[in-house]
C-alpha cells in the first residue's frame, strides 16, 4: 500500500496511548493558538482554527482547554509566540521527508531536527528539495471490515471527495482542503467509523521499501521526529509492504 495512510493509522494509535496523550494535546493546543493568532478567534470564520478545534474534540480535549488556547492565540491571555517553519530532507533508502515545525526557539529546533535525521540514516536538504513531491489534502481512512464499500463510495462521491483508494485492508478517502470538513461530516452523519481523519501531505510518488532493516530505520526516524516537542507533523513517501509494517511498527 502507499504507506502514508497506514503510517497515519499506526501513528494515531500510538498517540492514543496514555504516555503520549499529553504530547498530542500539546501539539493541538499549539496549532489552535497559531490558527487563532493568524486568522482570529471566531471558529466559524477561521477554517484552520475550525479544523484544529475538531482535532481537539476528537481527542476528547476539555472545552476549557480549547477556549484557553484560543484566547492565548488572540492575545486575550498571555501565551508563547510560536514560529512556523518547514524542514525537508531524505530518510534511509532515499525516502522524501517533510517536517512541519512550530517552535519558540528556532535554533533549538534546527539542532534537534538535524540530529534526529543524522542519527537515523537521513540528512536534511535544501528548502524545496522534496516539498514538490507532496500535495496538501484531506485524508479519511477506514478499515475494510468496518464499512461497506458501496456505502462508502456513495457517501464520499456525493459529499465531494476527490478519490477513494483501495489499499489492502483499508480504504482511504482523499478530499480537497475545501471539501474535507463536508466529507467528514457526511460520514459522521451516517455513523461510519473511520480510523483517521486529518489534513495531511499526500505523496505524489512513493519509494518502495522492502528491506526490513531499512524499514525499521525509517520508522525510527519518523518516531524520532514525531516525538520532538517542536515537530507538529512529519510526512514521508515510503511504501512499506503491510506484512513488514505490521511486524515492525
Swiss-Prot record:
InterPro entries: Integrase-like_N, TACO1_YebC-like_2nd/3rd_dom, TACO1_YebC_N, Transcrip_reg_TACO1-like, Transcrip_reg_TACO1-like_dom3, YebC-like
GO molecular function: DNA binding
Bilayer-spanning residue ranges: none
Biological process terms in GO annotation: regulation of DNA-templated transcription
NCBIfam families associated with the record: PRK00110.1, PRK12378.1, YebC/PmpR family DNA-binding transcriptional regulator
Similarity comment: family membership: Belongs to the TACO1 family.
GO CC annotation terms, alphabetical: cytosol
Name under which the protein is recorded: Probable transcriptional regulatory protein Sfum_0996
Keywords, alphabetical: Cytoplasm, DNA-binding, Transcription, Transcription regulation
Pfam families, per the entry: TACO1_YebC_N, Transcrip_reg
Principal location listed in the UniProt entry: cytoplasm
UniProt subcellular location: Cytoplasm
Disulphides: none
